[in-house]
């Protein structure tokens, strides 16, 4: 209204990994044509995954993929800290942790595998990995991640009011 007419608008939420072509951008159009939205998607394709989303889901998507890089960075840092505590040099621990996250994500996406399936494929009965997973579960790792996403979502809603 302030602009004096109806103009096409594309609302989007990119995340920081778009800087290296491995990001996620959710978007929706207001007063846009399918051709404009298609052109937009083509224009941004080098940024990573470009996903058209219902407007009412943008805040939830932002909590997962917009805030997710920070959550993932905390996980990578903690994993590296554990490696340092076990005797690895910091630079190697960080490199191993980051590459492991990248590779696990790639494996999941390329094989269309559920994360639980990948976890189960690494956990040998009575082995080291299942003991680590047990510790993560005992310490509330899964719940902490879920609550972090919900907190980010709720803050996004509050900021929009």
Residue ranges and their predicted role:
Residues 19-23, 60-62, 131:
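A short acidic, helix-capping loop that chelates divalent metal ions and anchors anionic groups
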Residues 2-8, 24-61, 72-110:
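Internal alpha-helical scaffold of NAD(P)-dependent oxidoreductase catalytic cores
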Residues 9, 58-63, 115-120:
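Short pre-catalytic strand/loop immediately N-terminal to key active-site residues, enriched for Gly-Thr
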Residues 98-161:
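NAD(P)-dependent Rossmann-like dehydrogenase/reductase catalytic/cofactor-binding core
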């Amino acid at each position: 209204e302030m602009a004096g007419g109806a103009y096409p608008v594309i609302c989007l939420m990119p995340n920081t990994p778009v800087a290296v072509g491995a990001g996620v951008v959710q978007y929706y159009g207001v007063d846009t044509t399918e051709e404009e939205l298609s052109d937009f998607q083509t224009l941004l394709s080098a940024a990573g995954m470009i996903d058209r989303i219902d407007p009412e889901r943008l805040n939830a998507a932002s909590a997962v993929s917009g805030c997710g890089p920070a959550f993932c960075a905390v996980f990578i840092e903690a994993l590296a800290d554990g490696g340092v505590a076990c005797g690895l040099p910091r630079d190697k621990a960080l490199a191993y942790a980051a590459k492991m996250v990248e590779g696990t994500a790639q494996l999941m996406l390329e094989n269309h595998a559920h994360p639980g399936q990948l976890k189960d494929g690494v956990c040998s009965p009575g082995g080291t990995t299942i003991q680590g997973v047990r510790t993560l579960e005992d310490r509330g790792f899964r719940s902490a991640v879920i609550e972090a996403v919900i907190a980010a979502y709720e803050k996004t809603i509050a900021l929009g009011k």
